[in-house]
Amino acid sequence: IAMLFWQRNQLAIHCSAVEHDGNALIIAGDSGSGKSTLTTKLLENGFRLMTDDVAIVDISAQDNVIVYPAFPQQKLCRDAVHRNHLNTEDLLYIDEDRDKFAVPRRDCFCESPCKLSAMLCLSVQNEDSDVLLTELNGHQKLISFLENNFLFPMFRNSGGFCTEDMQKCLQTVQTLPLYRMMRPFGIDSTDIQLQKIQKIIFHSEEDN
C-alpha cells in the first residue's frame, strides 16, 4: 500500500500527527521513544489528533506539503492508560504483544487535511540529561526524513532510492523544518517537551 501512495507522490510515514491552528506537526521516533506520551500531552493542551501511527503526506507540491487525517483513535500502552486515569474495561484491547489499548479521540480530532509545518523526531538519552530540541540541517535532515518512511527498508535493501525518488525527498526537506528532540530515559519530561515545542516550533510560550 505504501508503494501505491508513493507512486501518487504521497509518503506513508511512521509517526503520530497533531494539528494546531491549521498546521500539522508529525512526531516520529523508534518504539519506546515517547511518541504516544508526547502526543497525549499535546492533546491535553489544545492540539488535535490527526493520526496515531501512520501519516499519509502529499509531497506533490514541495512548498505546500499536506498531511491527511486517519482515525479518531490513539493506541496507548497500559501504563499510559493508567496515567491518564482511563478505565481499561471501557477500552478495546488491540495488541497483546505490546499490551496496548485503543482510546477514542473523537472530541479532539482534526478531520481536515492540513499543511505540514514541521517534523519532530524523538529519541531517548541518559536519565540525567536535559530535554534538547534542535533543528536539523543538511545530511542529518535528509537521513531522518528517509528513515521514518515506511518504504525506507525496501529501498535500502534494493540498493537505495533511484535519482527521481531521491529528488522528491530532497525537494521536500528543503522547505520542511525538521527537529530532533532528545529526552531523558525514565523521567516524565512532557511538560518541558511541550514548552519547547510551543516556543521553538510554534513560536509561542502560551499554553493552549
Positions of the model-derived regions?
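Post-Walker A alpha-helix
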Residues: 38-39
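Extreme N-terminal, non-catalytic leader segments
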Residues: 1-22
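Glycine-rich, often acidic-flanked micro-motifs
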Residues: 16-30, 44-50, 54-208
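Conserved glycine(s) of the Walker
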Residues: 33-34
